[in-house]
Design a protein with these regions (language model features):
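The serine-hydrolase catalytic nucleophile loop
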Residues: 15-27
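Conserved hydrolase catalytic core segment
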Residues: 28, 32-35, 79-133
Length: 298
């Protein structure tokens, strides 16, 4: 950013995404003045490949999202030298952002998420929350296949994919098709071929399909979706961006509010799981508004 007072913003992708998801929004967050905004709203934008994904160094064991959160906090503070930072993410990025908020609130000053894979250890409390959980569990029956495979026997799948570009493409594209708000029901009306292929090729050329899938195994080792039993509400100011075709349906606000210190809650008319690609301008606008206006004095 050309903003002399710019603040660092850590953007975190998930699976089966990559850093390529953010290519359309990085310039708008770093240089809003080039898109009709103000130079003083620009961020230093940091977009790492998660450990085991893409262009990050190879890992030799499964790492869960909590461990990755600690690694990334060290990366921001020790390696890059920032005193504090904001974080944004969807999918695994949202999970990691939550753990960063819990473990590193001294340094993380704001969270923006567009997905909620995390769960409160005490579960739902009221009838509305219980109804959501019942529906969520039913809806996930048809989604659990890939997740169970990657969380229990990821290497078996990896041997099939490591030398099969078509297999890798099929495994990934099925998610982009099923988790997105497709215009006219067609994937290429929502994503360009370049966007889809760039993401797939990152997995192929870096030979990271196997290690990227280990994060599911790592989460199982860390205890699963839920925070620990001694969990205390995350104090970091948090923005929630809800897109209607998100494959992980959002719980009621009352449930989310027991996890996060919600300062912004927005529901948008269009978009799905891959918000940075599907609705980049909406996502950018919400990020800029939250961090630069709602958290102006932080």
């Amino acid at each position: 950013s050309k903003n002399p007072n710019s603040r660092p913003l850590l953007l975190l992708h998930g699976w089966p995404g990559s850093i390529s998801e953010f290519l359309n929004i990085i310039p708008k967050l770093a240089h809003p003045e080039k898109f009709g905004g103000k130079i003083e709203d620009g961020f230093d934008v940091i977009v790492p490949s998660l450990p085991g994904f893409g262009f990050s160094s190879q890992i030799n064991k499964a790492l869960g999202p909590r461990k990755i959160g600690k690694i990334l906090n060290k990366f921001m503070i020790k390696n890059l030298g920032y005193k504090n930072y904001f974080v944004q993410g969807g999918d695994w990025g949202a999970t990691i952002a939550g753990w960063i908020g819990l473990d590193s609130s001294k340094y993380c000053k704001g969270i923006h998420i567009n997905c909620l894979p995390l769960r409160h250890p005490k579960g739902p409390k009221n009838s509305k929350e219980k109804k959501w959980e019942k529906k969520f569990n039913f809806d996930q029956i048809t989604q659990e296949g890939y997740r169970t495979q990657q969380a229990t026997k990821p290497q078996t799948l990896s041997y099939a994919m490591i030398d099969s570009p078509v297999g890798t493409a099929a495994w990934i594209l099925e998610k982009f098709h099923g988790w997105s708000d497709l215009k006219m029901g067609k994937i290429e009306k929502t994503f360009s071929k370049d966007e889809l292929l760039s993401n797939i090729m990152i997995y192929i050329i870096t030979k990271s399909f196997n290690t990227a899938s280990w994060i599911y195994f790592g989460r199982r080792k860390e205890g699963g979706r839920s925070f620990p039993k001694n969990f205390k509400k995350i104090k970091v100011p948090t923005a929630i961006a809800i897109f209607p075709k998100e494959m992980l349906e959002w719980p009621p606000k009352s449930y989310v509010n027991r996890i996060f210190n919600i300062k912004r809650w927005r529901k948008f008319p269009n978009g799905g799981h891959f918000a940075a690609l599907e609705e980049p301008d909406i996502l950018v606008s919400d990020i800029l508004s939250f961090f630069n206006k709602d958290l102006k004095n932080i």
